[in-house]
Regions:
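Low-complexity, Gly/Ser/Thr/Pro-rich intrinsically disordered linker/tail segments
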Residues: 182-216
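N-terminal capping segments
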Residues: 22-139
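...with weaker cross-activation on analogous glycine-rich loops/strands in unrelated enzymes
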Residues: 54, 115-193
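N-terminal Sec-pathway targeting helices
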Residues: 1-12, 20
């Protein structure tokens, strides 16, 4: 009887480990369905920073989706080039790549801002290769250079695909798809165990500290 119990326990443990192994660094790119049946007009920016014929708002959203579609694995690393180039990344890289391909090079922009306004940032030694990949620095940068929007999630019409949302220690891009309450999903990269890159998390978070739009 003891042998049977041990065998059953071993099988159960193996099953749990297998599930965990399948979840680790296997974040899904499958997009959730838009569940909102109401009508919220989409916002389109009047700016096209990179001159590609696509407005900033649409560009940022499309680029965020294109970036996570490459299925980056979660790991915090330092890069001499600033932008990750090896298939790894963190939450700030979703935003950095989304903006870079829309005409906004955060590496250059944040570094220039830190050097011009050091009093805004709590940084002893600026480092262009990493400063733009820190949430706290992006919070300062966007607060001064982006369009500030509401942090009230219930004002659903003011949350638009391509917006930027900052939490206390996390950042993401607002999706153009919404849950049944009209609250948009978030495109983000939080940890190696994350089930999907696009998730219904906005209503569940109590630590929203910023909501921005790159241009109007």
């Amino acid at each position: 009887m003891l042998c049977v119990s041990l065998a059953a326990g071993a099988i159960l443990l193996c099953g749990v480990l297998l599930v965990l192994l399948m979840r680790y660094q296997h974040t899904s790119t499958v997009r959730p369905q838009d569940q909102y049946v109401g009508q919220i007009p989409d916002f389109y920016s009047t700016v096209d920073a990179d001159g590609d014929g696509v407005d900033d708002q649409t560009d940022v959203l499309d680029n965020a989706l294109a970036y996570v579609d490459t299925r980056p694995k979660y790991k915090s690393r330092y890069y001499q080039t600033g932008y990750p180039d090896d298939g790894y990344g963190v939450c700030t890289d979703v935003v950095a790549f989304a903006l870079k391909n829309a005409g906004y090079d955060l590496q250059a922009l944040v570094d220039a801002d830190i050097r011009e306004h050091p009093q805004w940032y709590d940084i002893r030694q600026p480092d262009a290769n990493i400063d733009f990949r820190r949430v706290r620095n992006l919070k300062v940068f966007f607060a001064h250079h982006a369009v500030v929007r509401t942090t009230d999630v219930s004002r659903t019409e003011e949350w638009q695909g391509g917006d930027l949302v900052i939490f206390e220690n996390h950042i993401g891009i607002v999706s153009d798809r919404r849950n049944k309450n009209g609250v948009p999903y978030i495109i983000h990269h939080n940890d190696p165990w994350q089930a999907a890159y696009e998730q219904d998390i906005l209503e569940k978070r109590t630590d929203i500290v910023g909501h921005y739009r790159i241009s109007e």
